[in-house]
Amino acid sequence: MKRIFPILILVIAIAGQATAAVQTQNKLIVKSKRELDVKYLLYLPKDHAAKPEKKWPLILFLHGAGERGDDLNRVKVHGPPKLVEKGEAMEFIVVSPQCPKGMVWNDEVLITLLDDVAKRYRADVTRLYLTGLSMGGYGTWSLGLTHCDRFAAIAPICGGGDFIKAYNAGDANGKALKTLGVWAFHGAKDPVVPLAESKRMVATLKKFGHPGPKLTVYPEAKHDSWTKTYANPELYKWFLQHQRK
C-alpha cells in the first residue's frame, strides 16, 4: 500500500446499515498521489440503530496473507468476521479491512479507515481494540505500537514485528505504551512464524517497562493459533476490561 500523505480526500461508499448479526461490504477511497480503494467488512451490534446516543467499543481485525485480494468473502474465513457470518452476535463494532494482493498492512491507511468508521458509526474512542493473525499479527504489532495512544488493547496472534518500534513508541509516548493492554497468542509448533517472534516482542515490552504484556502459548498448536483464540469469550471480556484514559 502507498503511504498516505498529509492532505487526504475521503470518499465513502456505504452498502447500507448492518442489523443483527450481519456485516456489510464497504469501501473507503483515499486520494493522495494515487487513488486507493480500501474494502472492508463492517458489523454493527444489533442495538446500534436503536441506541443513537450510545458509543460502542470497536474491534479492528487484520487478516492473514492468504486472505489478500479483492473478494471480501475471503475475509470471512477466520476471526471475528467468521463468527459474525455464523450468526454470533457481538457487542462491538467490527471493522475487517482487506489488504490488496501483493501488499502488506499499511499503518496510515488503517488509521485513516479507523478514524472514518469511528466517527461515522459512533465508536467509543476510549475503547478501540486491535487484533490480527499471521500477517495481521505483524500488522497488529506494527499499528498497535506506532499508534499506542489510540488503542486500549491489542491481541496479536502468531505474529511478530520490529522490536525497535516498541522503543520508538515508548520514546514518543511512554505512558500510552505502558498502559496499552497486550495479549499475544502463538502455537509452540508454528512452522510458519516461529514462537520466538512473539516471545521477542513481549520480552522487549517488559524491558521497556511495560507492566504486564501477556503471552499465551498453545503447546500442540502449529500455525493456526487463531481459531481457539477467537472462539474464546475471555478474549472479548479482556478487551472490555481495558479503556484508554
Language-model segments: which ranges?
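Active-site machinery of serine-nucleophile hydrolases
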Residues: L58, L62-L113
